[in-house]
Amino acid sequence: VLPIYQGSQRQRWLVGTGLFLYDHLAGKSILPPAQWLTAETLLQRDPQLKAEGLLGGYAFSDGQMDDRRLALWVADQARLAGAKLHEHSDVIAIDTHGHVHIADSSYLHDRVINVGGPWAVTLLKQSGIPSPYRLDTVRGSHLVLERECPQAYLLEVPEERRIFFVLPWQGKTLVGTTEVRQQAHEPIECSVAERDYLLAAYNHYTTAPLSAANINSTFAGMRPLLYSAADPRKATREYALDRQGQLINVFGGKWTTALALAHKVQQQLL
């Protein structure tokens, strides 16, 4: 649900138009279309939702995933298909002739695919291979709160244009996310500042505020922002492919486009 309050940065007509287009451009779907819910209905669903200034909200459908479990499943599928996995093996260097150098040995392959994610350009740099792209890395942190979540929400951060999510998660409440620039070599973990930022945003919309003592756990992930050498001012969260000899580099990407990206990489292998 996306609640609309008096003074919200996104007005009802704008959100409604966007969700109408979202529903109709998506084509056939097993999911119900977006609908407007009154303030009374929202408060019946969640009595702890902030009532002051609440006009109502739009209910819409979306998906939820466990990225860690999905990644492990993909690895298992690769193993079942005959792939040999080397876990906890640091790649020291690669080259454009098919060599992969790890700590204690080297391998020669017909093709090498660099899917280092946020570290793809770092691997090229330490291998002495020029990159046509630059990656900046952005950390997104999350809180898992010791409270059941009766309703999933998409909410505005107070005094900002940013949005954040409050979602049911394994019997608890998941709150996220932040957007903080960081270096690829830095620890990927939720900072105290991010913790306080998310708690304050969450507490703005509840009549039963929580404190740091109510946090079950925190976690963070790192997203690559892709910059082209041709236009270093423009960033994107999409992906790009680059081929140099026997080496195929994948820059950027995200889970929602992973399958389409995999098909394009497969075409490069033919």
State the predicted function of each range.
Residues V1-R45, F164:
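Dinucleotide-binding Rossmann-like beta1-alpha1 core, especially the glycine-rich loop
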Residues P3, D23-L25, L43-A81, Y107, ...:
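Helix-loop-beta segment of a Rossmann-like dinucleotide-binding subdomain
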Residues L25, D46-L49, S127, T206, ...:
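A broad structural signal for alpha-helix termini and local helix breaks/kinks
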Residues Y58-H101, S106-R111, A258-A262, Q266:
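Helical element adjacent to the flavin cofactor pocket in flavoenzyme catalytic cores
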Residues R69, Q77, T122, P130-L174, ...:
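C-terminal catalytic lobe of FAD-dependent flavoproteins
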Residues N114-I129:
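Flavin (primarily FAD) binding-site architecture
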